[in-house]
Amino acid sequence: MIERYTLPEMGKIWTDTYKLQTWLDVEIAVCEAQAELGYIPQAAVDEIKAKAKFDPQRVLEIEAEVRHDVIAFLTNVNEYVGDAGRYIHLGLTSSDVLDTALALQLVASLDLILEQLEKLIQAIRYQAQQHRYTVMVGRSHGIHAEPITFGFKLAGWLAEVLRNRDRLVRVAQSIAVGKISGAVGTYANIDPKVEAIACQKLGLEPDTASTQVISRDRHAEYVQQLALLAASLERFAVEIRNLQRTDVLEVEEYFSKGQKGSSAMPHKRNPIRSERLTGMARLVRGHAVAALENVALWHERDISHSSVERVAFPDCCILTHFMLKETTDLVKNLLVYPENMKRNMNVYGGVIFSQKVLLALVEKGMNREDAYRVVQGSAHQAWNTEGGNFEELVRADAQVTALLSAEEIDQCFDPQQHLTNLAEIYSRLDI
């Protein structure tokens, strides 16, 4: 991923140096396990741990000749270790190292993602608490529907990110597996106990039934969950973009001092953060498809997945982490305009209260079809008339006033009637 969208702590996990260090960590854990079981001398392990290191540039030089990254790495490590190096990689295949080390990278990445997700949860919950009863219009199909509150809208966001957190916690367990089982997974040249001990040292569980690789359904699930999270963040971003439209302007991204929105139009204050999040979600979703394609490897393994994963895993983890940070900052600094919300809600003189009028008439004994016709007629007249006022038309309709008193009509147009049960929802989310 390009540096522009890479936060340092996540970018570090996907550097060559970090990757090679995880390879070395796996090799040393295996050596320690073999020594504990009496397969190799403890003195050799001590020497390996004291001398083992690598030079990323030297590894690349060797790989240019041998055309195999793990062999290049082992060759470089042995240049430092000397004779004790013969015990490194004993009974292993390259994927024992690659897949186990990859699990360490994916777990470390998910730790950062979950940490940032917690910050987003706190930011959304705080804003929801501040706007529990900030009344605005709810929209369906992009059209005014009925009153809601901005806190209620944010409650939906909060519930969604909490579900994302639950899914990521589950996938963290699924991906935290290693394999030290040899060329086709049968432990033909290594004791399964070595795998168990080595994985324990690394904080992993042994894979249940690996081949030459860990089955890619685990990795596909991992990327799917990141894609789901990215899709949620995109949903929030798209909502902000729509609410920031000039003719809506109910919320707005924070516009910092000195910031400029257009090279041509000085007045512009564009929702660029939300737009950027929308684009990033497309990238993560694209990688989710590629991760699914990687599941169907040939027999006990082919290498078709490798080139995909060298791009997809770093990109997905780095982008998702960046998106979370951007969304958190966006929510924390979001500008909210309650007066504009109230203004928009009252367009056409209260057509959004049409259902309340309909139900009130039905409760008074009017046939539902007749009530619908009466209310729709006034609503559409208000809608189609410049400066139309639905409430005034309702109050002037003899069919309505024959059944509803002025006080009962007042109640129909009271926004608070729509908010009476919000406390139940808020209590579920600690808002």
From Swiss-Prot:
It holds the Pfam family ADSL_C. The active site is at residues 141, 262. InterPro entries: AdenyloSucc_lyase_C (IPR019468), Fumarase/histidase_N (IPR024083), Fumarate_lyase_CS (IPR020557), Fumarate_lyase_fam (IPR000362), Fumarate_lyase_N (IPR022761), L-Aspartase-like (IPR008948), Pur_lyase (IPR004769). Its EC number is 4.3.2.2. GO terms for molecular function: (S)-2-(5-amino-1-(5-phospho-D-ribosyl)imidazole-4-carboxamido) succinate lyase (fumarate-forming) activity; N6-(1,2-dicarboxyethyl)AMP AMP-lyase (fumarate-forming) activity. GO terms for biological process: 'de novo' AMP biosynthetic process; 'de novo' IMP biosynthetic process. N(6)-(1,2-dicarboxyethyl)-AMP binds at residues 4-5, 67-69, 93-94, 212, 263, 268-270, 307-311. Pathway: Purine metabolism; AMP biosynthesis via de novo pathway; AMP from IMP: step 2/2; Purine metabolism; IMP biosynthesis via de novo pathway; 5-amino-1-(5-phospho-D-ribosyl)imidazole-4-carboxamide from 5-amino-1-(5-phospho-D-ribosyl)imidazole-4-carboxylate: step 2/2. It catalyses: N(6)-(1,2-dicarboxyethyl)-AMP = fumarate + AMP; (2S)-2-[5-amino-1-(5-phospho-beta-D-ribosyl)imidazole-4-carboxamido]succinate = 5-amino-1-(5-phospho-beta-D-ribosyl)imidazole-4-carboxamide + fumarate. Keywords: Lyase, Purine biosynthesis. Catalyzes two reactions in de novo purine nucleotide biosynthesis. Catalyzes the breakdown of 5-aminoimidazole- (N-succinylocarboxamide) ribotide (SAICAR or 2-[5-amino-1-(5-phospho-beta-D-ribosyl)imidazole-4-carboxamido]succinate) to 5-aminoimidazole-4-carboxamide ribotide (AICAR or 5-amino-1-(5-phospho-beta-D-ribosyl)imidazole-4-carboxamide) and fumarate, and of adenylosuccinate (ADS or N(6)-(1,2-dicarboxyethyl)-AMP) to adenosine monophosphate (AMP) and fumarate. Belongs to the lyase 1 family. Adenylosuccinate lyase subfamily. Homooligomer. Residues from neighboring subunits contribute catalytic and substrate-binding residues to each active site. This is Adenylosuccinate lyase. It comes from Synechocystis sp. (strain ATCC 27184 / PCC 6803 / Kazusa).
